[in-house]
């Protein structure tokens, strides 16, 4: 099978809206909290399976995968002839996406010459990339009232460079917290974002921010 442009593994066809994700992927529970987001993303071709019948909702999302999704949101612009300084881009499926994201300022390298395509994306990193992408949309001016991150038990652990992006993302309803048995709500900014979490965030992004998706 051909390598998937979105996940780098095996191409799974984007399913039309009338076909339920749980019918296509054997590891999707239609009663799961993440089902709506997964259905939204696969029906629009924003995300696909890791193989024909597997979505892997609990798997991590890599930098290459998230950049590829944003590239699709941007309409897959032609990046022929556009280069990057990164020497670790070893797979063809994400080359154009990385070039686009780097050129537009949506993403930076992990060093002047490395992109680290296989590195898992953290929740705060995903928030920043989404807000950078949103800043390119006509008329988008961010949140009128960025969220108070101190409301989260771990709000103080959000990296300084990510605080503005995360505060906007929370205010726009893209990210929320997880409540423990003691009633404290955790944002988990440094944890790797799962594929299910990214699907949910992308669905919220499409509905709350990029209304034309």
Region roles according to the model:
Residues 42, 102-103, 166, 170:
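Alpha-helix C-terminal capping/helix-coil junction sites
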Residues 11-35, 48-96, 104-124, 132-163, ...:
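Feature responds to low-complexity, polar/acidic, surface-exposed segments characteristic
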Residues 159-172, 199:
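Alpha-helical membrane segments in multi-pass integral membrane proteins
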Residues 4-11:
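Short Cys/His-rich metal-coordination motifs, predominantly Zn2+-binding knuckles/fingers
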């Amino acid at each position: 099978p051909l390598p998937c442009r979105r996940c780098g593994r095996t191409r799974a066809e984007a399913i039309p809206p009338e076909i339920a994700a749980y019918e296509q992927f054997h590891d999707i529970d239609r009663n799961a909290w993440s089902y709506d987001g997964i259905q939204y993303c696969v029906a629009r071709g924003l995300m696909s399976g890791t193989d024909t019948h597997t979505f892997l909702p609990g798997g991590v999302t890599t930098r290459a995968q998230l950049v590829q999704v944003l590239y699709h949101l941007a309409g897959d612009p032609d990046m022929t002839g556009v280069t990057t300084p990164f020497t670790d881009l070893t797979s063809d499926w994400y080359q154009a996406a990385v070039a686009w994201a780097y050129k537009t300022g949506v993403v930076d390298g992990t060093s002047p010459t490395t992109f680290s395509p296989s590195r898992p994306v953290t929740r705060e990193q995903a928030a920043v990339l989404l807000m950078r992408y949103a800043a390119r949309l006509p008329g988008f001016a961010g949140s009128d009232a960025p969220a108070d991150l101190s409301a989260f038990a771990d709000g103080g652990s959000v990296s300084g460079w990510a605080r503005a992006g995360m505060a906007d993302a929370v205010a726009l309803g893209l990210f929320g917290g997880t409540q423990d048995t003691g009633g404290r709500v955790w944002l988990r900014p440094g944890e790797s974002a799962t594929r299910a979490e990214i699907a949910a965030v992308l669905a919220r992004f499409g509905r709350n921010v990029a209304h034309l998706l």
